[in-house]
Each structure stands twice: as C-alpha cells, then as structure tokens.
C-alpha cells in the first residue's frame, strides 16, 4: 500500500518543513497542487526543498519545471488532457527520453478507469469517502461498485477523498494500491508529519 500526500491549495504554515519531515519518514511522492501560484512563485516554493528530494515532487501545473528543476513527475489535469495532438506527441516523446518521469491523473468516474487507454504511473480516484476538505463533497461510489471495478483497472489506482489512517485497511480491502492524504493532513490539530506517520504505519501493518 503506497501513501502519497497532496499539498493544500492554500498557504500552510511551515508546509515545506512538514513535507521534508514526511520525506524523512518515508513519503515516496508529494504532489504540489498550487493553482494560485505563478510560475515564478511555484519555482520559489520548489526551491525550498533540498535537491535530494526533488525526484519525489510531482507538480500539477507549469509542467516544464519538471525538466528544468529535475523533478519527479507531472500530474495531468483535465485541461492538460484536452490539449491537442501536438501536446500529446510532446508528452509521448518526453516520456521516451525521461523514462523515470512519473505521470499521473485523477479519475472521477469508475468507467473511466477501465476505459482509459493511456498509460500512467498511478492514478487517483476521487472522492472515495466524504471529503475532509470540502464538507459538501460526499463519497461518490458504492462499496460494491468499487469491489467490482477497481480490480479491472489497467493501472494502479489510489483512493482519494476522506482518507486518513483509520481508512487504510478498508482502502486495501477494496483493492486500491495506494491512498492519497490531503484534508486529513492539513486540517488536523496534529502536526501534518505525525498524521502521515500514522497512515504509513497503518499501511505497513497490512
């Protein structure tokens, strides 16, 4: 069971310090989703991380920075996936050259998981449970549907939405290969790296 963490879209006190502590504790990938940051601001944010952790950073915007800053990967949003043939060709060639480049995306429909023909390093399915970040966003899938569809996925699927340490065993039972932490990390009264450690410990007990 893999555990990844997504950044808060808003500013968080000592966010990079907390993420570095997570890396030290065993975090494999940290997804940087900062839609409000300019390219310059995002670059400055990334530069707060030691170089030894750059390959564990996956960015959701300004994908060119993945090459210039030697980052781990890119996450393709709906906007990126809707771009034309030239963009897809450029991405295909880039993956041929940068063979270790992590490429991910998010699914919001179960049918898309089995119909997707493109190859990704891993994918997110959201929202699996009631969101911690957005109180009005409820889990979108029945347990029965997940048990049927997740095993049919052609690539690794990680559960996102309402995920915390207590959910890890259930996520594994549903067939997911990983879990995505967001609200449980950044909205907790505990330090974010402590929340991550608890989830990682739960995953190791499976």
Model-derived features with residue positions:
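Generic hydrophobic/aromatic pocket-lining and core-packing "Φ" positions
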Residues: 19-20, 46, 63, 113, ...
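Structural motif
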Residues: 25, 69, 118-119, 152, ...
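Boundary/entry segment of secreted carbohydrate-active catalytic domains
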Residues: 1-13, 203
């Amino acid at each position: 069971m893999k555990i990844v963490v997504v950044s808060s879209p808003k500013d968080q006190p000592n966010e990079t310090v907390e993420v570095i502590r997570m890396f030290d504790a065993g975090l494999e990938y940290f997804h940087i989703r900062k839609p409000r940051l300019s390219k310059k601001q995002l670059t400055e944010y990334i530069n707060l991380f030691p170089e030894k952790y750059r390959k564990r950073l996956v960015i959701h915007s300004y994908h060119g920075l993945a090459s210039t800053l030697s980052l781990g990967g890119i996450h393709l949003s709906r906007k990126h996936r809707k771009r034309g043939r030239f963009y897809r060709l450029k991405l295909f060639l880039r993956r041929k050259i940068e063979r270790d480049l992590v490429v991910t995306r998010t699914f919001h429909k179960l049918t898309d998981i089995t119909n997707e023909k493109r190859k990704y390093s891993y994918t997110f399915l959201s929202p699996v449970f009631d969101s911690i970040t957005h109180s009005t966003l409820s889990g979108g899938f029945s347990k029965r549907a997940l048990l049927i569809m997740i095993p049919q996925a052609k690539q690794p699927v990680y559960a996102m939405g309402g995920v915390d340490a207590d959910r890890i065993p259930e996520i594994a039972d549903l067939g997911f290969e990983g879990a995505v932490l967001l609200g449980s990390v950044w909205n907790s009264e505990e330090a974010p790296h402590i929340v991550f450690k608890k989830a990682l410990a739960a995953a190791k007990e499976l």
